[in-house]
Amino acid sequence: MSQHHILPQHQRADLNRSICDYVQRCGAEESLVVGLRQLFGLSAEECDATRNGRDPDLLLKKWNSIIRLHRKILDLEQKCQQLTEELEAVPTEAYGKAGRGVSHVLWTPRSNPTFQLDVGASVTDIKLHPSLPIAFLATDQGKVVAYDLFNRSMPLHSTQAHMKGVTSLAVMEAENGSLLISTTSKDLQCKIWSFTDNAAFQLLRTLSSHEHIVSQSCFLRSGSDLLLATCSRDLTVKVWDTKSGWCIKSFQPHNQWVRTLELHGDYVITGSNDATIRLSHWPSGNGLSMAVMHEFPIERVLIIPMRANTAQKTEADDDQVELEYRKYDPDYSPLGFKYCISCSRDNLIVLWKIPLPKFIPHRPPQPNLLQTNFEKVHVFKGHTSWVRDIKVRGRHLFSCSDDRSIRCWDLVTGQCLKVWPEASHGFINCLSVDSDVSNDKLLRELFLSGSIDGKCNVFMR
């Protein structure tokens, strides 16, 4: 039977000589070496690497290089497969069946960031401008930096907002079209800034009343007034009038550090170091209900507001998450929301259904003694360290963690849809994602993450 060789004659000869060299260097018996020479048809002079000026370690080097090349081929094939999957998903995600603007809320970022911003210090919070391609980054050195995402060679503006680290940012468009920015800090202060037309920060108010670290702030529009709520390590939540700078309400919802809050109308949800989440009526300070399941401090809470009963139904509303978590419920209309989400240092994210308080005419709402605890709807498990931030966009829930990963979850099924396993070289502190409002004329698809290594990853379509 004829033999078919893959290698040509000269390469076979080199391989045979290299095998003999390797066996000799390994100290094999002379009989084995002689047998190999006879098998390969080589003389003793041909197998002498020193005499022929041949590298005696050639076989070992070739073998190692083949392994490295094979590993590189596997990595490239995996990357090619990921890019192919993303490319195939673009038409359905971006345009859907009925054209662009219907399914854009289902967009998920690609595997690799479009570009990266470096601010040189730990990024503690990120916010997007509501209508312009501008990102505001807060750092642990007290700076706030504004970047134009389409011209990122230099920051638009940077200011030393606080003497110590900035803990959070909040943005709100004022009635006159200007942009208001709130910064909270470890220096016990909260400041309100105006981002002017010439891309500069102008200080409007300094709010000083907290006696410890100010953790987070949140704007609230109440009629013609614009209010700001803050929470602090001094155990209090305070509500401020942004025009006068007066504190109009202060109350204590927890007995430990209040780390996070979210407002909707007259109601506020807070999360604390005591591992509980509480619903309060802030004008009266009444505590209404609470959630007890987490075992470690709460890092972030989010309210999922209901759609107004008068809101027109769009094709995007056919999505299950719109029908379930955002649909109008007349019983909850005084509250304005039915569900909230929390994340904690116990590595868990929990979706909660909020019990209805007792609504009494001409009196503040009271706790419902028959149901004082939130109802657990779903627990999202997957992170292996503290979950630091969460954001909701359509039916997608995004989360970041100290395990250096970002995850995208389906709010309806609880399934983890996508994982960015090494999204950063350091702990990921914060996320920011553009609006998921279906009538948003911008239809932006932006996603940002900030980490302790001073990098901000920007994902865009």
From Swiss-Prot:
A single GO cellular-component term from the record reads: cytoplasmic microtubule
Q: SMART domains in the record, alphabetically?
A: WD40
The record, for PROSITE patterns, names:
WD_REPEATS_1 (PS00678), WD_REPEATS_2 (PS50082), WD_REPEATS_REGION (PS50294)
Pfam families found in the cross-reference section:
WD40
Localization, UniProt: Cytoplasm, Cytoskeleton; Cytoplasm, Cytoskeleton, Spindle pole
Example of a GO MF term: identical protein binding
Name the keywords, alphabetized: Cell cycle, Cell division, Coiled coil, Cytoplasm, Cytoskeleton, Microtubule, Mitosis, Repeat, Transport, WD repeat
Q: What is its main location?
A: cytoplasm
| Spans of repeat WD | 118-157, 161-203, 209-252, 254-292, 318-362, 382-421, 423-461
Look up the coiled coil feature and give its residue ranges. 64-93
What is one GO biological process annotated to this record? vesicle transport along microtubule
What parts of the sequence cross the membrane?
none
Query: Would you identify the family this protein belongs to, as annotated?
Result: Belongs to the WD repeat LIS1/nudF family.
Q: What does this protein do?
A: Positively regulates the activity of the minus-end directed microtubule motor protein dynein. Plays a central role in positioning the mitotic spindle at the bud neck during cell division. Targets cytoplasmic dynein to microtubule plus ends, thereby promoting dynein-mediated microtubule sliding along the bud cortex and consequently the movement of the mitotic spindle to the bud neck.
Which PANTHER family does this one have?
A: WD REPEAT DOMAIN 5B (PTHR22847:SF637), WD40 REPEAT PROTEIN (PTHR22847)
Please describe the quaternary structure of this protein.
Answer: Self-associates. Interacts with NDL1 and dynein.
Q: What is this protein called?
A: Nuclear distribution protein PAC1
